[in-house]
Structures are given as C-alpha cells and as structure tokens.
C-alpha cells in the first residue's frame, strides 16, 4: 500500500524522524487556518500517490496565510496525471542549504535490502542514476545486522554527503531504517533529505510503501487505506476480485496469472520503444478462470481507462482451456456492446489452442486481431496504440 505524504510523515513522527510540522486539510479555509497556526511561511502540497506534483502546480510556497488560502483554492481539484487532488498538506517551509536523497528498499534480485544515498537530492533519482551514476551509492544491507549508527554513517559517506553532516545524517538514516523494519515497509524514500543553514537534517518529502502481506501483524495500517482516493478503476476491479494496478501507458493488459501478466508488461514496454515510447497501461490478472463474465469485467475495467488505445489479451490455457477463453472473449465483447471500442490483440497458447483460435477466427469480430506469439502480439498492440 502506497501512503500519502501526510500519512508517511505520521510514521516519521512515530519513529522520531525529524521533519517539518504540518497538518492535512481538504479545504482552502483549513489551509489558511493551519498556516495561521504555524505562524511562518508554509508549503501547500497536493496529496496524490504519484510523482510530478511540483511540475503540475501541486506544490506552492505561501508567505502568508492568505497566500496559503489562494494556493489551496487552485490546487484542490487539480488533475495530476489522472489523480484528482482532494487533500492538502500544509507544512512549515524550511530554509534549505543542501538537498540529498535517501531510500531503503527491497533488492529482489539479490534477495536482500538496499540503501540508496546521494548528495544529488531534489530531482528524480532516475535522472541521477542515468546522468551521474557515480553520485548515487547503492549499499546492500544485511537483514540480520541491520543499520546501526556506524553503518548509517558509512551509507551517508558513500553517498558523498559533506563531512560536517555525516554524524547528524547517520542518526536520521538509522531512524529511517528502524521505521522501514518496524512498519514492514518495502520502500522508504526521502527526496529531499535536506541540510538547513544551521546544519540540521530534515526529511522534507516522504514516500512509503507498506507490505500488504504483513497486515495481519500491522492492524494500525488499516487506517491508512483511503477508498475515496483509490483509483476508481482499481475499486471496480476489486469488486470483481481482479488484481488490477493502473499505470501510465496506452496498452491495456489482460493476462491469466500474475507471472504471465508481468511478462506481458515487459514485452509491451520493449515493443513500445519502437513505436514512440508506448507503455503498458495497467497490470490485470484475471486468474485461472476466463469465463465470459470474468473477461467482460476485465475488459470493462481496462477500457474504462481513457488513456488506453489498444488491449493485449495474453492467455495461456491450462485448467481453463483456450477454447473456453476464446468463447469468453466473444461473449464478453457481446456483453459490453458499444463499450468495447478499442482494438484487441489476442494471443492464445496451451490447452486446446487450435480450437480457441478457430472460435476467434470464425467469430470474425472487427476489433479482434489474433496473433500467434507473444512478441508479435506486443508489437501489434504497441503499433495500434501509437496510431
């Protein structure tokens, strides 16, 4: 579960990670009241679970409470990459001497944890990794030993933080590790981690992802779930017991099985590079069954995304045979009627594949293109999305 910034900062306070005081509100009047209470210039920050807030006008400096009110009026209701701003964090503005970057995350490839630290904070970390890789330290963390002050200082030193802040930064880094472990997080990211003119270290921004598999031992995390702010397509998918995650691309993905769906994301992203940077629009696993009702629900969710230009249905027939899947696709298109208005690229393989292909061929639906291999299907879906 991804947290809003204000929720992440609640965990900062719980674990004594230094940050700036502030409160959340959903009205312009509330923003003015909080700014008045703080009594200093503030930052008015849109609360959305996506990057790029600043470039979209979702983060503003307010010198006075009236400025906070005016900014809040403009930010509330703002559409940031499909996310509508419904809440604001109003936090005390901080004097900044330098900006750094710090994160803890799972290193799945090496089956361990990873600390990342850089003196180049305040910008997209992907940009730092691409343009100044020598300025980004990637430090493996032993899960048993963890991060004590000495190791935290080493992380800061490898990230090229100035010598005069190493000890202070180490304290904050150790506290962030404590949070990471205690809260069963898969990501704790601070960008920027700043040094003030008086050499204090503050975590000004916060991005935290919590591991839903640990909910059974983290009952307090339930309060962080915000159904009103959850993507409506994700809510619709949840109602049908479908595993759906919205992304920012143009090719809708439907796969039966999480592994196949993940592989489909990869091949579409690769194929999309040849077609103007087309990307996957979602992850959707319809599970082992692909009945007409399940397929219709999946298509309904995927086609509800206005960014989707084509759909790639990638199914491997196992217990559910390919002929049953093909029948489900044909029936689903009939059930959806005019709502099924984007081209579908279908790739079938596995149990009874020839019969499945025959059913789709004879149906001769104008929206359906039947393709033999996954690579060809990904290329076709990306081509259609770029047209």
From Swiss-Prot:
The keyword Ligase applies. Keywords: ATP-binding, Ligase, Magnesium, Metal-binding, Nucleotide-binding, Tricarboxylic acid cycle. Binds 1 Mg(2+) ion per subunit. One of its GO terms (biological process) is succinyl-CoA metabolic process. PROSITE patterns: ATP_GRASP, SUCCINYL_COA_LIG_3. Signal peptide: none annotated. Pathway: Carbohydrate metabolism; tricarboxylic acid cycle; succinate from succinyl-CoA (ligase route): step 1/1. ATP binds at residues 45, 52-54, 94, 99. Its EC number is 6.2.1.5. It catalyses: succinate + ATP + CoA = succinyl-CoA + ADP + phosphate; GTP + succinate + CoA = succinyl-CoA + GDP + phosphate. GO terms for cellular component: cytosol; succinate-CoA ligase complex. InterPro entries: ATP-grasp, ATP-grasp_succ-CoA_synth-type, ATP_grasp_subdomain_1, Succ-CoA_synthase_bsu_CS, SUCC_ACL_C, Succ_CoA_ligase-like_bsu, Succinyl-CoA_synth-like. SUPFAM superfamilies: Glutathione synthetase ATP-binding domain-like, Succinyl-CoA synthetase domains. Substrate binds at residues 256, 318-320. One of its GO terms (molecular function) is succinate-CoA ligase (GDP-forming) activity. Its cofactor is Mg(2+). Mg(2+) binds at residues 191, 205. Residues 9-236 form the ATP-grasp domain. Succinyl-CoA synthetase functions in the citric acid cycle (TCA), coupling the hydrolysis of succinyl-CoA to the synthesis of either ATP or GTP and thus represents the only step of substrate-level phosphorylation in the TCA. The beta subunit provides nucleotide specificity of the enzyme and binds the substrate succinate, while the binding sites for coenzyme A and phosphate are found in the alpha subunit. HAMAP family: Succ_CoA_beta (MF_00558). Belongs to the succinate/malate CoA ligase beta subunit family. Heterotetramer of two alpha and two beta subunits. This is Succinate--CoA ligase [ADP-forming] subunit beta. It comes from Mycobacterium bovis (strain ATCC BAA-935 / AF2122/97).
